[in-house]
Amino acid sequence: MILHKCSLWNVAEIFFIEPTKVHYIKEISRKIKLAHTSVKKHILELVKLGLIEETSQVFKGYKAIRENPEFIFQKKLNNLILLKNSCLIENLKEHYPKSIILFGSYDKGEDIESSDIDIFIDSKRFNILLKEFEKYICRNIHLLFKEETDKRLIESVNQGSILYGER
């Protein structure tokens, strides 16, 4: 994916994946293997865009502005890119579901570190190992099959994003 080759996006992704944590320039530099001077430049750009803010701690840290609609939008894009790049949807499609729908906080871009990814699959139950996908996306994955869906979840599923097939 083109965006993942952009160092600004790589810095922003740290805040998308761990949106409640305070991050530090040197920590980000180590995680994404980018010079701390470049990280600092990108941090200042993200502050200017209103996606993150400086914390008032002894050491200068930065945290996501999770209420900002632009942060939510960019986070949602990042979530979809991670799902696509993980190949999870391609693996699920091998079981011939009628549709695959992402719903819940991950779909809305409102997920935090402890959130899971809710995916509805219009199919009979099948087994799939999720560990590698969960490791790549940094979230637990919860698959909900058609036969297991109760009435209260139908509304959430109907508001979700179609990743494959149709409603």
Language-model features, listed with the residues they occupy:
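Catalytic core of pol beta-like nucleotidyltransferases
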Residues: M1-K98, D107-E113, D122-R167
